[in-house]
């Protein structure tokens, strides 16, 4: 059985006059024609505007004002209609989303009183659907937190700007339904590349500059200490004379001024340490000079060795050439020598020897020719 409208709506229809019932009848016919064409698949925002009605397609529906049956309940009698309509509506086809069969995909039954009495939804409330409840805190927190974490100096102005933006969003929700520009990238991140190096640069330079500044103080510490000690003991001459004067001049200087035992001990200590320092400097200087001289001598000897090696190679090559030439000369001479029988001498059995006067003799190998005057 089809659902019926509530009792309040039915009583409201009973109290209407005849003229008002005629106007409601026309309005209801227009609504039914629109729902039959569109299949009642409209969105959740109903729009019932009488200025643009759909064309009239056929005879009007039954005279009932609700999806109930034609016979009303016994407890709620209805007045007779002002005019009679055809009882049979068999010539009008029943669409799939017909009103009589209630094949309408809605959550509550449709009634004339309900449609007319139900107020339209507020457009601002519709725009608020999907927005998170509560104040827009996530948009303000990233800016203020990131500014503090990155040592950004303008964190207070960013916080005020985020508060002002939240107030505007609450006032003008219809103009700015969803805002993301401030949450995508905080403004402090754009300045992080410039603020971090400026803060780290002095820290990186301080350790390196400290030892460099302390070196001149360490070098002049001994001299300044001797000067302070001499000034405290009231020595009447500077420390440069104590260290640099020769022995005779230094003794004359001490004899010229009457000094106490403590002053003499201090002067001799300053001279001893100054002389040791000068001697150490001279020793280092002599060592450096000796090292430089040895390096130069080593370089000279290396060059001389290379020259001698080249000369030895040339001498070996010359000696080899002379041996080859001597062998060829032996072969040539023995080819021209003949004995009484006309036979040639063998180089393996005979050898050529030269006397002191330059005469050359042919002698058997293994014998030596005695020198003759």
UniProtKB/Swiss-Prot annotation:
Q: Which residues lie within the region annotated Disordered?
A: 127-150, 205-226
| GO MF annotation list | DNA binding; DNA-binding transcription factor activity; DNA-binding transcription factor activity, RNA polymerase II-specific; identical protein binding; RNA polymerase II cis-regulatory region sequence-specific DNA binding; sequence-specific DNA binding; sequence-specific double-stranded DNA binding; WW domain binding
Q: Which GO terms describe its cellular component?
A: chromatin; cytoplasm; nucleoplasm; nucleus; PML body; protein-DNA complex; RNA polymerase II transcription regulator complex
Q: Which Gene3D superfamilies match?
A: Transcription factor, Skn-1-like, DNA-binding domain
Q: Which Pfam families match?
A: bZIP_Maf (PF03131)
Residue ranges annotated as motif PXY motif 1: 61-65
Q: Where is this region: Transactivation domain?
A: 1-206
Principal place where this protein is found? nucleus
Q: How is this chain modified after translation?
A: Phosphorylated on serine residues. In undifferentiated erythrocytes, phosphorylated by MAPK8 which then leads to ubiquitination and protein degradation.
List, for all copies, the residue spans of the domain called bZIP: 266-329
| Free-text domain note | The PXY motifs are required for binding WW domains. PXY1 is required to promote transactivation of beta-globin and for hyperacetylation of histone H3, but not for binding to the HS2 promoter site.
The protein's role, per its UniProt record: Component of the NF-E2 complex essential for regulating erythroid and megakaryocytic maturation and differentiation. Binds to the hypersensitive site 2 (HS2) of the beta-globin control region (LCR). This subunit (NFE2) recognizes the TCAT/C sequence of the AP-1-like core palindrome present in a number of erythroid and megakaryocytic gene promoters. Requires MAFK or other small MAF proteins for binding to the NF-E2 motif. May play a role in all aspects of hemoglobin production from globin and heme synthesis to procurement of iron.
Name by which UniProt lists this protein? Transcription factor NF-E2 45 kDa subunit
Provenance organism: Homo sapiens
Q: Which gene encodes it?
A: NFE2
